[in-house]
Amino acid sequence: MSVFGLQRLYIGGGYVDATSGKTFDTFDPATGELLAQVQQASAADVDRAVASAQEGQREWAAMTAMQRSRILRRAVDLLRERNDELAALETRDTGKPIGETLAVDIVTGADVIEYYAGLATAIEGLQVPLRAESFVYTRREPLGVCAGIGAWNYPIQIACWKTAPALAAGNAMVFKPSEVTPLTALKLAEIYTEAGVPAGVFNVVQGDGSVGALLTGHPDIAKVSFTGGVETGKKVMSLAGASSLKEVTMELGGKSPLIVFDDADLDRAADIAVTANFFSSGQVCTNGTRVFVHRSIKDAFTQRVLERVKRIRVGKPTDADTNFGPLVSAAQLDKVLGFIESGKAEGAKLLAGGTRLTDGHFGSGQYVAPTVFGDCRDDMKIVREEIFGPVMSILDFESEDEVIARANDTHYGLAAGVVTENLSRAHRTIHRLEAGICWINTWGESPAEMPVGGYKQSGVGRENGITTLEHYTRIKSVQVELGRYNPVF
């Protein structure tokens, strides 16, 4: 018997049964308890969701921008009213500590919807005079039906981040959450409907990557916004282009450098490094897992990091005192443990953690101890590949030019950060780092106003910020001739 019972699809403003006859299970990563059986969408269900979205989008786009803005603001109010309920569900589904989900996941999702609700009325075109009797004007029009494909680490936040600009611009969205964490996207659908979003404007289909492929290849979808791994992202981009030249936004993986210079405040640097590696049990795409520390301060910095790691409170995610929970699944646990063994085998010095936690209640969950490796080299697997778990690699460096070259020596380019008291060095270094999201003397905050996305193979396009709204519209150019038409023939 599952905790939440059978979960259906959400299409056309309400719950409907999938036609596939298939279900999949979702589990509590802290206890192994069966949370729900979830119906998997078929190709016919995806077609139904897209058709429903097309119908709803026509009604939604016909509303004034102010009407859409007011409805989205009501959704924000409902999200905030239900913050505690949604946070508790997100904690069960992801294994994140309740203190984290209460303060971050729904809060930041609501903030982004509120931000774009405010921008909905600011979507406007241009008027360009050509000559006395002729001018051009432009219109920004919605794309139509968009697809959103979410990741398992921030389920409801990602759903909010993808729907907010899409809906603000007058589009509809068919959303597929990760099959690992499928529950809270359905609650967001309920909230949008209660707020007054027309039926079909936000539909949720469930399933694995095959359902994502159906969305990506669907001829009636105009844009795909995907969050996930690099290899899957390449497949999404290929299928989106091959099917109908869809627009794509992709936020992919990272192996981000955090550079600690010799003039850094060591306590601040250690605090930043621990947050940048162990928040959300290390399951954050922007984590600063390659920690480059100037050789002259490496020992003192490492000591401070280890002191802070000892203070991490690993425990049950539902306990208010816990600030470090399990990994999201058994598969993710096995992957992370494999990387840890690789680090040991390649000669990295294990300074903390490095094991699965199995004592007491930990034994039924997917827990791994916060892990720190020292004496790391650039060619090690734990340094070059994205782990997506609580594994910090400490490397030393001598010069600014050297560390910048090493930091950039990766096919990733999602995030980067520096810790230094020298303002000139901070900006000089950041300007040379090949990363789309950068922090100086801090790490990790992604406010609604800040565009989020990567360089290189870490992504295409951006989430959040004003620029993202533009990419959920298309420009129509119109020339108006007030004078006499001069025929060619």
From Swiss-Prot:
The record's listing under InterPro entries reads: Ald_DH/histidinol_DH, Ald_DH_C, Ald_DH_CS_CYS, Ald_DH_CS_GLU, Ald_DH_N, Aldehyde_DH_dom, BADH
Q: What is its EC number?
A: 1.2.1.8
Q: Where is the signal peptide?
A: none
Entry's cofactor comment: Binds 2 potassium ions per subunit.
> Which amino acid positions bind K(+) 2, per UniProt?
L245, K456, G459
Which family is this protein grouped under? Belongs to the aldehyde dehydrogenase family.
What subunit structure does UniProt give? Dimer of dimers.
PANTHER family cross-referenced by the UniProt entry:
ALDEHYDE DEHYDROGENASE-RELATED (PTHR11699)
* Identification of the protein by name: Betaine aldehyde dehydrogenase
